[in-house]
Structures are given as C-alpha cells and as structure tokens.
C-alpha cells in the first residue's frame, strides 16, 4: 500500500491504538473508569513508576549509601565506556550528514502534500526550549570560566600556551560540548520517530523506532522494555536540567534578596513552587501552553543576550563569535575522537594531567544528552509533521548549533572578560572583595572562577551598573519559565510513552508524572546537598549508558526504513527463518531446549549449520571441534584464575573466546551470503558476541528450515494486527463511548 493512500482517519485511529497484556497476548485497550479516566500501558507505567519511586525512596532512606554507590558508578562507567560514548557520537553525526546529502533527503515526514504544522520561528523556539534552554543559563558563563581557570577537575591543558590561547580554548571546549554532538542524538531518534509515525502510521512511542528491525515484536515484551528504559532515562535527564535550574534560581533570588539563603531546603521549596506552575500549564496543552511558553522564554533569552551584547563590548563579542566558529569547525573532528586515553591512566611523570576531566565533562555531557533523547526527540517529532528529512535536519541540527555558538560567544565571552579583568585587578579567591563568598564586588568586578557556579551568571549581570538588577530579575523569570516548559514537556512525553503513544493522554496522568519529576528532583537535591552537581552527573552517565546501545540499533532502523520506503530494499526479501529473540516472544519446547543447550555447547548448533552450508557432513565435526576447543578452554582458564592456580591466564581465555566469536561470525556471515539475507558482518559479530545461544539456534534452524518467509512486516501504514477498523474510530474518538465501568 502506498503511503499516499493512508487516509487521515486511519492515521488518527492508528495514533489511538493502545495495548495491554492479558495471558501474554496483546489486546486493544480503551478507557477505564476507576473513579477517574485513565488510559495507559500498565506494564510500562507500573514498572517505570516503581523504578523511579524506588530510587526516590532509596535516596531518602539511605542517602550515604546512594552517594557512595554513585561515586563508584561515576568512576567505573567512564573508565570502561569512554570509547563507546565517543565513537557512537561520531558515528551518528557521520550517518546524519550522509543522510542529509543522500537522495532520501526530500522524503516528507507525512503525506506528500502536507505542510509543516508550525512556522519556522515557532518551531525553532519550541525545540530549543525543550532541548537546552534552561541549561544555557546555568552553563552560559560558568563553563567557559571553568575551562579557563583551575576548577574542580582542573584544566584539561597545562601551561601549554599563552593566556589568550587558554581563553580561546575554553570557548572551544564549551562549543564542542554544546554543538553538533549534543543535537545529533536528538536528530537521529526524532527523525526516526517522525518517519515511522507520520509515514507508516505507528504510535508515537519509542518502541515504534524498532519496528523496521523487529516488526510486530514491538508490541511484546521487547517494546515494553524499550519504553520502560525510555521513561526512566527521560525522567533522570529532565530532572538533571530541573535541578540545575533550581540551584541557579536559589542563587539568583539570594542575590536579589539576601534574606533568602542558598540551601537545599530552599531549593526543594522552589522545586515544588515551580512544579505547581507546571501543573497549571499542563491543562493548556501543546499548541497553547508549551508553544506560548517556549516563545516567551526564547524571546526573553534573546532580549537578555542582546542587552549584554551591547552593554559589554560589541566588537569584542563579534570578533569572538567569528573566531570561535572558525576554531570550532577546525577542531571538531580532533576533539570528537579524543578520549583522554593517557590522562585517564593518571600516571603522567610530569603530573601535568587532569585524570577526572573527561568523566566530569565530556562523558557527563554525552550521558546527559543521551538520557534526554527520548524526551527531546519525541517532543521534536511531535512538532515536525510535514517537513522533509532535509528540512528536519537543518532545523534541529544546524540552527540550534548556530544559536549555541552565538550564546556562548556573548555570555561566555563576558564571563571570561570579567575573569581576566579581575585577575589584572589582583582579585584572588582570598581577597576581601570579589572572593568566593564576598557579597560586594571590587569596582563592579568579581572573580568568577572563585565563585559558586550557581551564581556566576548573576556575577556577570551585576557588572552592568543600574541595569544589573534588572538583568538578574529578567534572568530569574526566564529560568523559571524554562523550568515550567521543561517540566510540562517532560511530563507530556513520559505520559505518551506510558500510554503506548496516545497523543492526548488524560491530564491526570500528566499531573502524576509531573509530581514524579518533582519527587525525583527533590531526591537528587537531598542526596547531593552541596555536591548535587556530582549526583546529577552520575545519574546522567549511568542512565545514558544503556540507551547508547539502543540508539545504535535505531540508527540502523532509520536507514532501513528510508530504504524500504524509497523502494531500494525489499522488506519481504530473504530473512532468517527465525529471529534472534523469537524464542522469547513465541517459545516452544524445542526452541527453549535448543537455546539452553547452546548456552553450554554453542559449537554443536553452529557446527551443524556450518556443515550444512558446505554440504559436507564430514566437515561438520571439524567445525564443531574448532569452536568447542576455544570455548571450553576459556571457561577452564577463568576457573583456574578464580582459584588462584595460574595468575593472568584468564586473559589467554578471553583471547581464545574472541577467536570463538570470530569463527562463529564467519559461519553466520556465510549463511547470509549464501541465502542473500540483508545485513553485514558487523551485525553478525554483534549477534554472536552478545547473543551467542540465540545466534546458534538461529543458524541451525535456518539451515534446516530455509524456505523463503516474510518474517518482518513493513507496511507503509500500521500493521493489520494493530489497525483499528474505521467503523470503530468514531467510538474511540468519543470519550463517553470509550469509557467502561470497572
């Protein structure tokens, strides 16, 4: 069916296709009255709520244990997975750039004749407000200053160049963190979600992103797992931004009214005050509430930026803008692949290294961006209908990056200028004026690097004479409004995820998730205290790690989706006779037994398949022997290492195990090539290494049952199993007709 024939009625009905599990089967879900109107996926909603509220309870009951555990995570994850974070970001960026210039760039996210729902200016303000608005106020001044002067994690570079070069490098590092590598994760997922949602009629939920790869299995436990992870990641990603905003709000209010102390208690009060405003905003919906708030926030931010631009030194800001843009483009590849490999070892003979810099900055940011991906991407997808792929990439990739460069050139430049002026005036962290806790400046100057990060923004605003208080007050209003916008958008996205993509979930459910956001932010503040920023960084890194793997699969899904839609890939072409995870979704006694046997003897099924590929049963046992020897040798060596019989022998075992994976990859690759199954050797290696029992069963099953099958459905509209008959659509659209008394 051509996508142009999908009627608007079908698409509206598809958006309201909801499911719940009864006896391991999926059924359509309507609205239920339990004294109130609710529409949700109970599996996703309950499990997600239990995980999040369990974390909140853990933070409140055992804050010391949470702190120590977070410290361990913060060390272990970057040490182990820095390479994965760095490489994945670069790969996604390269993929999106290639997609932009490909022939698929003109494909529209919707019907061919559809127009964009929002004007470009409104669209930009909405996606920017959901993306990074509130965080730019927090880091606009602070991050360049931190990179310029020795901070908590020291400087990345030590005495390598002049002070001017050091200042420029601080801007370069800041732009690296807030540029292409931030927005690339939102582009990949947002584009995929909009594509499958508006062109193929799938529900607007993260599980739909995997439909091009696993078909109808997204409506089973795999889809539940994806949505649960997405809800949890979204909650922690949004709360990171909210807590940063709260800490800055507290510092700003204290600056204007000294009787209001900077304390965790006051910050918690601010959380719930602003959360109350967000709950009120929830009733206004997307087009009125979030749209108008986003436009107001963006306008206020631009107004403040222009005032600072003219108040400070316009020529200096313009010079810095042009210069920083050039340096950013010049060094983006070099910085994008830098992992601080030597610095993380912490053994430099000259001691000129910052061992904690990478995990405190780049990896923390990458984890934060990835954790926010479900939230920002789904929100962007919701407002992107009617745009082409190329228009989408430009709007969500180039425009926000350009604005971020402008923002940091103005505010970061102002902060660096104050820092350098204070240094020339001999203001140090021990000075009576301008020092860490000073309430008064020295001739309008503070030393930002000596000050609390929450108040650096207001230190810079205060230097503009009589306008300082006005700018500070205006900044507080902007931060508070961005807080409301982020909370409102976050609760909307989380509610959609927990309701199987329902575009208009009940308000009460959004209120529940807004309250959950407030509770999570409160827990992070309570645990972190004065070190709340460390707690936030740890949560971001930890929640972003598992989603990095999911994002890699989503990139593959996006590429497959556009190729199928363009007719360059036959979705009904040759496939493996069974999917890797079919045994979990549709288990049989035979398949379960085969997988269990393959856990301990994968060589048997793999060797059988290898012999059948070559049609030489005599070589079957040769293949089995070649794979069995390294597999069992690895296990034996791990046992010897554990028993302290032979120190270091486990590494020999790991090497042999890698050889087993490589050989098994060759077997799976030969099966694919023989039967012309779509894929590549990298996918084969990943399948064998991560899911070797399932891969072994899949290979043997295919060789014994290799009749052509249409294993994965890829219709342009919603699959038949999920479509709502047009005759029932009016009932679904009528709230009274959908309600059932329980």
Q: Can you describe what each PLM-predicted range is?
A:
Residues 218-480, 502, 526-532:
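Membrane-embedded translocation segments of transport machinery
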Residues 16, 36, 51-59, 93, ...:
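Helix-loop-helix module between adjacent transmembrane segments
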């Amino acid at each position: 069916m051509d996508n142009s024939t999908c009627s608007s009625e079908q698409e509206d009905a598809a958006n309201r296709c909801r499911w719940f599990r009864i006896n391991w089967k999926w059924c359509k879900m309507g609205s239920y009255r339990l004294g109130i109107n609710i529409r949700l996926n109970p599996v996703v909603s309950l499990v997600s709520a239990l995980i999040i509220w369990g974390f909140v309870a853990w933070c409140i009951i055992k804050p010391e244990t949470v702190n120590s555990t977070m410290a361990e995570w913060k060390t272990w994850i970057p040490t182990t997975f820095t390479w994965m974070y760095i490489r994945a970001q670069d790969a996604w960026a390269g993929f999106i750039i290639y997609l932009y210039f490909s022939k698929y760039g003109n494909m529209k996210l919707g019907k061919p004749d559809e127009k964009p729902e929002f004007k470009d200016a409104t669209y930009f303000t909405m996606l920017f407000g959901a993306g990074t608005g509130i965080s730019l106020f927090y880091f606009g001044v602070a991050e360049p200053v931190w990179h310029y002067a020795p901070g908590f994690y020291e400087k990345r570079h030590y005495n390598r160049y002049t002070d001017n070069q050091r200042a420029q490098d601080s801007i370069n590092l800041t732009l690296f963190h807030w540029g292409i590598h931030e927005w690339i994760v939102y582009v990949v997922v947002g584009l995929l979600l909009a594509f499958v949602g508006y062109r193929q009629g799938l529900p607007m939920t993260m599980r739909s992103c995997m439909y091009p790869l696993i078909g109808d299995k997204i409506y089973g436990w795999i889809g539940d797992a994806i949505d649960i992870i997405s809800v949890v990641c979204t909650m922690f990603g949004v709360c990171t931004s909210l807590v940063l905003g709260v800490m800055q709000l507290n510092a700003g209010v204290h600056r204007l009214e000294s009787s209001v102390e900077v304390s965790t208690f006051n910050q918690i009060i601010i959380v719930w005050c602003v959360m109350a405003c967000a709950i009120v905003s929830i009733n206004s919906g997307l087009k009125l509430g979030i749209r108008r708030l986003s436009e107001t926030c963006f306008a206020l931010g631009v107004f403040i930026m222009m005032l600072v631009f003219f108040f400070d030194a316009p020529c200096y800001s313009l010079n810095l803008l042009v210069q920083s843009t050039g340096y950013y483009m010049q060094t983006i590849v070099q910085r994008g692949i830098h992992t601080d490999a030597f610095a993380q070892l912490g053994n430099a003979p000259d001691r000129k290294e910052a061992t904690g810099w990478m995990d405190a900055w780049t990896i923390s940011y990458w984890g934060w961006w990835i954790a926010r991906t479900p939230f920002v991407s789904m929100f962007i997808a919701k407002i992107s209908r009617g745009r082409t792929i190329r228009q989408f990439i430009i709007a969500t990739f180039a425009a926000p990056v350009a604005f971020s460069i402008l923002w940091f050139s103005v505010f970061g430049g102002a902060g660096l200028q104050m820092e350098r002026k204070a240094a020339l005036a001999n203001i140090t962290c021990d000075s009576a004026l301008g020092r860490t806790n000073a309430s008064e400046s020295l001739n309008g100057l503070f030393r930002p690097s000596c000050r609390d990060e929450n108040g650096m923004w207001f230190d810079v605003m205060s230097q503009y004479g009589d306008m300082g208080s006005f700018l500070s007050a205006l900044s507080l209003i902007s931060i508070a409004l961005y807080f409301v916008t982020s909370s409102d958008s976050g609760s909307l996205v989380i509610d959609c995820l927990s309701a199987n993509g329902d575009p208009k979930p009940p308000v009460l459910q959004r209120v529940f998730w807004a309250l959950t956001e407030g509770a999570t932010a409160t827990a992070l503040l309570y645990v972190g205290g004065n070190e709340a920023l460390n707690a936030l960084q740890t949560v971001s890194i930890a929640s972003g790690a598992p989603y990095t793997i999911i994002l890699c699969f989503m990139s593959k899904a996006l590429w497959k989706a556009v190729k199928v839609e363009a007719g360059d890939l036959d979705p009904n072409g040759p496939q493996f006779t069974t999917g890797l995870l079919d045994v979990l979704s549709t288990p049989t006694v035979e398949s379960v037994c085969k997988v269990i046997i393959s856990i301990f003897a994968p060589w048997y099924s793999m060797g059988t398949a290898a012999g059948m590929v070559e049609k030489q049963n005599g070589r079957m046992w040769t293949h089995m022997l070649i794979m069995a020897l390294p597999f069992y040798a690895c296990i034996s060596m791990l046992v010897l290492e554990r028993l302290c019989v032979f120190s270091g022998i486990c590494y020999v075992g790991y090497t042999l195990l890698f050889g087993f994976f490589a050989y098994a990859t060759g077997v799976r690759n030969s099966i694919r090539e023989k039967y012309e199954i779509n894929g590549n050797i990298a996918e084969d290696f990943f399948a064998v290494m991560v899911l070797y029992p399932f891969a072994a069963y899949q290979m043997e099953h295919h060789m014994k049952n290799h009749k052509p099958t249409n294993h994965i459905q890829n219709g342009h509209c919603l699959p038949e199993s999920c479509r709502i008959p047009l005759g029932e659509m009016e009932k679904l659209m009528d709230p009274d007709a959908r309600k059932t008394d329980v």
